[in-house]
């Protein structure tokens, strides 16, 4: 058959080449086909005329050599269709369920047509193609459904989820009727569903009538009667009805209109409903794998970070080669285009199979316009799409690796389309400085260079923190005025959306939610929007779809996915500090040009000390660096190439594009935990350097999570459970029940549009985009935990097409090269010696706003606000101040926790956003509950510190209280939901409180949580009687913090 087609029509090696070869006006008259050519998933593509002689052209439908698949090109007509799949352990169970489920689904389809489309169809209008049969581990139900009446044709125009008039609507409607049809997220915990969601996407494909499974040639798709379920013998003319993309225009054709709000009901369920997550990436992968290896089990990960699998039933045929293997397992590698299965057998070397998607954004990206080019403007499709966007689109989104010409693309847009009013939103000062250096000749004004209201300027670069400066208040008409911009640009959109989690956005009169919703309204009334990034997550997807919805564009956003991958990098990660330092300084002494990317500012300072001794020319950028360095970032290429060593901390995550061929090698220092950046931001830091002489990046990660296997081999933990959106949403919905108050809410504005300005009036609803993005931000922050960080980092490295390797030791025996220095102690000594009378805080605040502070001035501001936080208004002894700074500097939150827990300050008086305030109230409630149980009191919201000076708890009293805490306390009765409040890793205590040795895990948790709130539970004494030990314990507040707080409030 395939040879016949090759004689009749041109064969294409890529889908896009085939599609582009057919003018849009001609596509409805063609049949688009693909067929596999080898076991690694490669296909050829062809186009033939869509006419009544289709089957006579391809001839016999019984040959096992046929593997044709229909392709439904986006924008062309296709009939309603479904793909039914299910697995059974035996043929008996298959036959029993087959007779039940198929008639049930057919009847539900008839119901959907009546209810959703107001169309009456009969049983005979629902056509069935059966490919069910024996699989390697039981029996598989496989039936394709096509709704194709003889006297008329129903059709949709696409198969994407987020679109009008889509075939996905039938699937969504059916699983709304019966949740049994939907695949469950965890393959192992619940029965598999029946309807396959994977067949609904851009340019979807399905096997056609008579087509067989590749490469075995078995289980051909045969027509069966929808009533008797018996096999049918059809003529070529009758078979045309079973072709999904064959639309007979001689019959009446009816478009099935499907509003977006209806079709997306199911796909958005995860965001709307209070259901905790039931899976993690490992379970999702196992779900995908079991479709091809039903007896598969996961066995950890390889050194390269791949996911290893094996299978029990050795009669299962390898899906790559069609042969059986006696012992070989297989593995899955995750890329940005999805998950691919590969086999360890030499017989399958070089072969792979695309399994599907794990990340929720993968399909969204896959449905974008696909290009593969080193520089965006080199692809002829890009200028064409720009024209389409200018003529009829709102949003232009680009996913493209760093260094692929996104900046030049924006210059091209500004040059060609002469857009007069442009707002460029940033999230980092370094990004703003770099962009200003590149675009100041276009007339842009940087918010960093003016203190005035930005409303008067037509082209503005502004950081989110200062976004409110673009509006002007009309005091005469009592209105706020905002320009209607021709274009809004958000470069590095992921970082921008993540920035809304910053606590610095929350002020007494405004918070991050308000700023975010203001940004959305500005974009809504602008003419055009561009968003760009090297990576796109669910946050950006939600953002793009929301803008599309509120501007009534209905799917008119244009997105480009540039799959071009620059040179592959290999990240070699070690926990051997001595080896890392040895290699680093050996390269510096060899006069190599080195870049050090560090997640720790302290590590940068430590290296700087050694470089000063060596007389090495270097520059380091941290948050504490002199602000004058930021000016040099406007011409970073010229500035950095003058240095032998360049070091930077997370103060430079985005915006810098160093394009010179200068650096020989890169070294990285990785740090996990709450006080540093997330894995995505770390890789953004690495990406600032576009060219490296050596693509092998050596990384030191002291906290790397490991375990020792039976052979004493050190194994990195790459598959820890991660927090998900569903986790956080379910926890917040639970928290809301505690106080009967909404935490996740919606604040929107009623808008009044004028010719050049917009005015806003507040209005409330129930849930909004900010909450969705905020929860995803919080997930990202929680997954910085030491046990989870590497799991996320490994995924991101693999998805980017890079490699990861490990060089681990049990103990670092090497003598340190660098002297031990205490950066914090040195910093405190400098602050102690500063003469406060020589500094004017108002003047320094102005310099801070203008980015003109020196390192010493930054330290004075830090000292000033530390003393203010502790209520120190008068001169204080230097030794006393040093003692306080040593204990509480950068830990001032302990003071505020004390103030709130003991009633000195209200939570409502803090500058946190409303969500954080509600979390603080719940945490306070948990601590109060612990104390009440321990001492037998009934405090409500606050404790009394005067009565917690030193309460003695006898052994019997403590034992009873501990048992009650484990069984009944607010925290331990639902620990899994409260862990994220205290930034603990996902999971719950598995210890058995009935076993004495395991009670210590509950005890340590109790002691630690109380200590975080300045309450000390400790053993005062131990007594042994008749060989049995008893303990006397005490509960008290931290006396030093108590004294600080009392002093602060006594002098107000």
Curated annotation (Swiss-Prot):
InterPro entries: P-loop_NTPase, Replication_origin-bd
E.C. code: 3.6.4.-
Positions contributing to ATP binding: 400-407
Domain of life: Viruses
Catalytic EC class: hydrolase
Keyword ATP-binding attributed: yes
An annotated GO BP: DNA replication
Domain Helicase ATP-binding per the UniProt entry, residue ranges: 389-561
GO molecular function, one term: hydrolase activity
Keywords for this protein: ATP-binding, Helicase, Hydrolase, Nucleotide-binding
Record-stated family: Belongs to the mimivirus R1 family.
Protein name (database record): Uncharacterized putative helicase R8
